[in-house]
Amino acid sequence: MTLTASSSSRAVTNSPVVVALDYHNRDAALAFVDKIDPRDCRLKVGKEMFTLFGPQFVRELQQRGFDIFLDLKFHDIPNTAAHAVAAAADLGVWMVNVHASGGARMMTAAREALVPFGKDAPLLIAVTVLTSMEASDLADLGVTLSPADYAERLAALTQKCGLDGVVCSAQEAVRFKQVFGQEFKLVTPGIRPQGSEAGDQRRIMTPEQALAAGVDYMVIGRPVTQSVDPAQTLKAINASLQRSA
């Protein structure tokens, strides 16, 4: 992977891999992070770690050279969501997300909150349908559309509001690239190398399949974090992706 210049002290990688840091122990998380190279991936910090260890933990990861996807899925009244997104930008994260189901006014307010940050603003992504959800789960909420159709409706709203892209399942990526264009970024969890267990993600795909489907950033968790040699696992994934490109 080629290390390129950044507008900040954070390293920039051209790898599409984002490793999910799902730890409840700060030292264990940092011990893992110190085994891998920021040129090989970005890192995702979610609700558990951010609640436990706060912004300072994000700064520690940034000081090690990593770009951070702050995966807090903001979903609130427009003013509150906008202030939260601006706070994430102040923290210097690379990507932040909101729930598309928060609606157009909320997403527009979040986007407008990033205007003062200019080129230093993080990517603003909306969550469509959680990858753990199936049609029966949506039906329980009164949604009669299929997960794919509902995700597409929310993605269309997201693009209309001017956000950078959406979180979606890999199965939706081909259709989304056709409908929303190449510049609309697709971020996909549930990506697992061949031979990995599915875990709690229902709709999964391998990194190579995700790349072919049009996924821009693929979130990979336990197959890397629980690997005996995570650095080598990352290098193998990236090498395979380069061969598939």
Swiss-Prot record:
<comment type="subunit">
    <text>Homodimer.</text>
</comment>
<dbReference type="InterPro" id="IPR001754">
    <property type="entry name" value="OMPdeCOase_dom"/>
</dbReference>
<dbReference type="InterPro" id="IPR013785">
    <property type="entry name" value="Aldolase_TIM"/>
</dbReference>
<dbReference type="Pfam" id="PF00215">
    <property type="entry name" value="OMPdecase"/>
</dbReference>
<dbReference type="GO" id="GO:0006207">
    <property type="term" value="P:'de novo' pyrimidine nucleobase biosynthetic process"/>
</dbReference>
<keyword id="KW-0665">Pyrimidine biosynthesis</keyword>
<comment type="function">
    <text>Catalyzes the decarboxylation of orotidine 5'-monophosphate (OMP) to uridine 5'-monophosphate (UMP).</text>
</comment>
<dbReference type="InterPro" id="IPR018089">
    <property type="entry name" value="OMPdecase_AS"/>
</dbReference>
<comment type="similarity">
    <text>Belongs to the OMP decarboxylase family. Type 1 subfamily.</text>
</comment>
<feature type="binding site">
    <location>
        <position position="192"/>
    </location>
    <ligand>
        <name>substrate</name>
    </ligand>
</feature>
<feature type="binding site">
    <location>
        <begin position="71"/>
        <end position="80"/>
    </location>
    <ligand>
        <name>substrate</name>
    </ligand>
</feature>
<protein>
    <recommendedName>
        <fullName>Orotidine 5'-phosphate decarboxylase</fullName>
        <ecNumber>4.1.1.23</ecNumber>
    </recommendedName>
</protein>
<dbReference type="GO" id="GO:0044205">
    <property type="term" value="P:'de novo' UMP biosynthetic process"/>
</dbReference>
<feature type="binding site">
    <location>
        <position position="131"/>
    </location>
    <ligand>
        <name>substrate</name>
    </ligand>
</feature>
<dbReference type="GO" id="GO:0004590">
    <property type="term" value="F:orotidine-5'-phosphate decarboxylase activity"/>
</dbReference>
<feature type="active site" description="Proton donor">
    <location>
        <position position="73"/>
    </location>
</feature>
<dbReference type="GO" id="GO:0005829">
    <property type="term" value="C:cytosol"/>
</dbReference>
<keyword id="KW-0456">Lyase</keyword>
<comment type="pathway">
    <text>Pyrimidine metabolism; UMP biosynthesis via de novo pathway; UMP from orotate: step 2/2.</text>
</comment>
<feature type="binding site">
    <location>
        <position position="22"/>
    </location>
    <ligand>
        <name>substrate</name>
    </ligand>
</feature>
<feature type="binding site">
    <location>
        <position position="221"/>
    </location>
    <ligand>
        <name>substrate</name>
    </ligand>
</feature>
<feature type="binding site">
    <location>
        <position position="201"/>
    </location>
    <ligand>
        <name>substrate</name>
    </ligand>
</feature>
<dbReference type="InterPro" id="IPR047596">
    <property type="entry name" value="OMPdecase_bac"/>
</dbReference>
<feature type="binding site">
    <location>
        <position position="44"/>
    </location>
    <ligand>
        <name>substrate</name>
    </ligand>
</feature>
<dbReference type="InterPro" id="IPR014732">
    <property type="entry name" value="OMPdecase"/>
</dbReference>
<dbReference type="InterPro" id="IPR011060">
    <property type="entry name" value="RibuloseP-bd_barrel"/>
</dbReference>
<keyword id="KW-0210">Decarboxylase</keyword>
<feature type="binding site">
    <location>
        <position position="222"/>
    </location>
    <ligand>
        <name>substrate</name>
    </ligand>
</feature>
